[in-house]
């Protein structure tokens, strides 16, 4: 969901309701934008254009996102938060940590972060601790690796995009996906 409006009739649907062809299992919130469009929320400015102060932006204040996610979490929905930038990933992990602190069996909850693109090493540690499943847009590496490295975020951050090898080494479950037709 972008914003906090609840779609008409959505409150009548329960998690896992449906049939063999269509079942409702989750709700997705959009915490930031795209790295290629320089709208993903970063802690440090983008590298391009040179000298920029652009850091992208969060779509929600942290408390607003928490208050939007909590009712769905409490009803048992699988929650996914779109977070490309490290600032948005921080926000998603902070909210997930707060939500999981209030439940008896946190390991039974299915929480995802979609994209998990520009990362910091400590985010991988917290992701594992919380049991969050990152979903990587693996096309970023093939189609955008060079622009990330040379222009968008620079070498150091580009070397940490979509860190599936690090996640595998640490025993963290993760998924791959595509944003087709937006990108392959």
Language-model region placement:
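Active-site-adjacent helix-turn-beta-strand microarchitecture at beta-sheet edges
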Residues: 1-78, 124
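Active-site gating loops and adjacent loop-to-helix segments of metal-dependent hydrolytic enzymes
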Residues: 35-57, 99-108, 133-155
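Long, K/E/R/D-enriched contiguous segments that form extended
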Residues: 65-72, 86-94, 114, 118, ...
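Distinct, well-ordered alpha-helical segments
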Residues: 8-13, 89-102
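Phosphate/diphosphate-binding loops
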Residues: 1-28, 108-121, 147-175
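Active-site beta-loop-alpha junctions enriched in small/polar residues
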Residues: 2-6, 27-30, 82-86, 116-118, ...
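Short acidic/histidine-rich active-site segments
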Residues: 35, 77-87, 136-138, 167-184
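Histidine/acidic-residue-rich catalytic or RNA/ligand-binding cores of hydrolases
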Residues: 89-97, 144-150, 180-184
């Amino acid at each position: 969901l972008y914003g906090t409006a609840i779609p008409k009739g959505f409150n009548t649907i329960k998690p896992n309701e449906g049939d063999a062809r269509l079942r409702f299992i989750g709700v997705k919130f959009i915490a930031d934008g795209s790295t290629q469009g320089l709208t993903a929320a970063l802690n440090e400015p983008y590298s391009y254009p040179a000298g920029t102060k652009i850091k992208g932006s969060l779509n929600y204040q942290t408390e607003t996102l928490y208050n939007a996610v909590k009712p769905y979490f409490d009803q048992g929905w699988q929650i996914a938060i779109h977070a490309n930038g490290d600032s948005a990933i921080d926000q998603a992990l902070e909210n997930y940590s707060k939500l999981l602190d209030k439940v008896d069996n946190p390991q039974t909850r299915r929480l995802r972060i979609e994209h998990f693109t520009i990362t910091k090493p400590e985010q991988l540690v917290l992701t594992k601790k919380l049991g969050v499943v990152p979903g990587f847009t693996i096309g970023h590496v093939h189609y955008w690796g060079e622009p990330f490295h040379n222009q968008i975020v620079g070498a150091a951050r580009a070397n940490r995009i979509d860190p599936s090898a690090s996640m595998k080494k640490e025993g963290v479950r993760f998924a791959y996906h595509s944003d087709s037709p937006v990108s392959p």
